[in-house]
């Protein structure tokens, strides 16, 4: 990704790859108008990276691709869609011992995601009950509780597009409709929807308006749609690996920066949810990964423990969500420490997909 002559461009370094595991490395040199890239097939997102600010280190994701035509979608680029041709057929899924262990892990993780989105569904209904009653303080408490379930699972479910909508149409993007942040440009055709629009009203406005009630009703409906979708999903080991890595990357890009919860400042609650979700995805892969690279498993175990120990230092039973409010002062003093403990874990998790995708 680079800006050339005032236009933000997004280019592939090859337009054809053989079927099988493919690792995509994404670098944004100086294109401020582009902050995400998605790999699509038949309007379905099969891989993605977000928060690609100019100048950050390159990031990667690994997916197993079968033969056919795919599209690389870079929202905001001068040419948003590019075609990637995958030749041949992907090798048959390995059936050896390690593959079987990893396969069981994906089933366990699918059960976990169904559980989390089910609890999210209950959580937004509780939030809606408080909003409809006009109780601001009860709504704030319900908001914090519901956020945790979204943050544990967001990397797995955020790419869903409702039937009848094209990728890139925010009217059908469940991620936009549920979790659009204050820092994200508002789609004028759709408006600001979801959790953070409600957060704005509760904390910045300090009042529940008819508009807040409408937003809450919509949120319940959209989470209900998501709840229906996740029960049908199946995952590959690399999906779990990429998801765990993405959740930790989310912490670096939106939690430590204070971008996620711009009004409530419960970013450390979201931080904890991302860690828990990443840990669950990793734990589902761990028995198989231990047979592939036991040293990496020990390293990741230690890094998770370091993160959890650091996070424990911010617990506050009197605060909303059980963690200290992430004030500007706390961010200024502690962001470097939080970044230092998160980065090594992200680097380690980012190598897992390549290891599990070909395991036999």
Short names for language-model regions:
Residues 13-32, 59-75:
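Beta-strand cores of secreted/periplasmic/IMS beta-sandwich domains, seen most often
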Residues 1, 21-29, 90-97:
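Short, low-structural-confidence N-terminal segments
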Residues 1-19, 122:
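N-terminal edge beta-strand
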Residues 4-5, 53-94:
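Extracellular/periplasmic metallocenter environments
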Residues 93-360:
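Mature extracytoplasmic or organellar-lumen-exposed domains after removal of signal/transit peptides
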Residues 31-35, 80:
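Short loop/turn segments at connectors of secondary-structure elements within structured domains
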Residues 43-51:
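Surface-exposed loop/edge segments in extracytoplasmic proteins
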Residues 36-40:
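Beta-strand signatures of extracellular beta-sandwich domains
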């Amino acid at each position: 990704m680079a800006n050339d002559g005032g236009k933000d461009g997004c280019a592939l370094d090859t337009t054809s790859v053989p079927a099988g595991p493919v690792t995509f490395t994404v670098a944004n040199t100086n294109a401020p108008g582009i902050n995400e890239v998605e790999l699509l097939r038949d309007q379905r997102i099969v891989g993605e990276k977000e928060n690609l600010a100019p100048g950050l280190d390159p990031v990667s994701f690994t997916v197993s691709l079968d033969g056919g035509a795919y599209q690389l979608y870079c929202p905001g680029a001068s040419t948003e869609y590019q075609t990637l041709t995958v030749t041949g057929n992907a090798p048959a899924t390995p059936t050896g011992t390690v593959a079987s262990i990893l396969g069981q892990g994906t089933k366990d993780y699918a059960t976990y995601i169904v559980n989390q989105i089910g609890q999210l569904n209950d959580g937004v209904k509780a939030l809606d009950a408080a909003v409809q009653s006009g109780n601001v303080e009860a709504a704030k408490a319900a908001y914090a509780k519901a956020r945790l379930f979204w943050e544990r699972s967001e990397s797995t479910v955020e790419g869903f597009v409702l039937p009848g909508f094209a990728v890139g149409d925010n009217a059908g993007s469940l991620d936009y409709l549920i979790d659009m942040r204050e820092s994200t440009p508002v789609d004028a055709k759709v408006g600001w929807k979801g959790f953070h629009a409600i957060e704005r009203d509760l904390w910045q406005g300090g009042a529940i308006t008819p508009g807040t009630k409408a937003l809450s009703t919509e949120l319940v409906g959209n989470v209900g749609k998501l709840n229906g979708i996740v029960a049908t999903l199946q995952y590959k080991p690399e999906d779990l690996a990429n998801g765990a890595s993405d959740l930790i990357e989310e912490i670096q890009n939106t939690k430590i920066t204070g971008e996620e919860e711009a009004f409530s400042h419960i970013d450390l609650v979201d931080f904890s949810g991302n860690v828990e979700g990443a840990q669950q995805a990793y734990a589902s892969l761990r028995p198989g990964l231990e047979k592939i690279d036991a040293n990496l498993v020990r390293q990741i175990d230690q890094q998770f423990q370091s993160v959890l120990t650091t996070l424990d230092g911010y617990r506050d039973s009197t605060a909303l969500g059980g963690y200290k409010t992430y004030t500007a002062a706390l961010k200024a003093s502690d962001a470097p420490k939080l970044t230092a403990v998160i980065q090594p874990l992200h680097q380690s998790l980012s190598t897992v997909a390549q290891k599990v995708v070909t395991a036999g």
